[in-house]
Design a protein with these regions (language model features):
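Active-site flanking residues adjacent to catalytic metal/cofactor-binding acidic residues
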Residues: 57, 112, 132-133
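Conserved beta-strand hairpin/beta-sheet module of binuclear metal-dependent hydrolase folds
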Residues: 8-93
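Catalytic metal-binding/acid-base residues of hydrolase active sites
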Residues: 60-62, 115, 136
Length: 163
């Protein structure tokens, strides 16, 4: 069995978000008011080459996140609380191919959650079985999903039926 950590770009967030200053709405307010940014942090995905098949834990971010208009301008977090840098060659599908893992060979995707820095690479794996908690799926795809920071309009068309 082999385990690979794959960096699919970098992200900077407000220092108070990373430190978890406050609780509930106070924590959110602290994040928005913070003027300090973290150094760039790695956005990671994981591949586990297992005897029963390849398992991917999270799919990292997509290079489309670096394009103007990818994030909703109306959302204050995406406008003021997040900076991402992702090059096309950093996308998870291309990196796994360089390791000799074809996306079509990936048996399972284990999604810790469905924010874009963890689910941005879903489009590379249309044939994989997706494992995600029902609560997380409902939060991400429900009426309030976009307000909660999920880019459910960016999920692949096949995703709703596969999860």
């Amino acid at each position: 069995m082999k385990i690979h950590a794959i960096q699919t770009g970098t992200v900077a967030v407000k220092t108070r978000q990373r430190e978890g200053v406050g609780r509930g709405k106070r924590r959110l307010l602290n994040t928005f008011l913070d003027r300090e940014w973290t150094d760039p942090l790695p956005i990671l995905a994981w591949a586990i080459e297992h005897p029963e098949g390849v398992i991917i834990v999270d799919t990292g971010e997509t290079a489309r996140a670096s394009e103007p208009g990818y994030f909703p301008r109306w959302h204050p977090y995406f406008r003021t609380g997040l900076r991402e840098w992702v090059a096309r060659e950093e996308e998870v599908g291309l990196q796994f191919e360089r390791l000799g893992i074809q996306p079509a060979e990936v048996r399972w995707l284990v999604m810790t959650h469905l924010h874009t820095d963890h689910a941005g690479g879903l489009h590379h794996f249309p044939k994989s079985e997706i494992l995600v908690s029902r609560v997380e799926l409902e939060k991400a795809t429900g009426r309030m999903g976009r307000v909660r920071g999920y880019l459910n309009n960016r999920f692949p068309d096949w995703f709703q039926h596969a999860a």
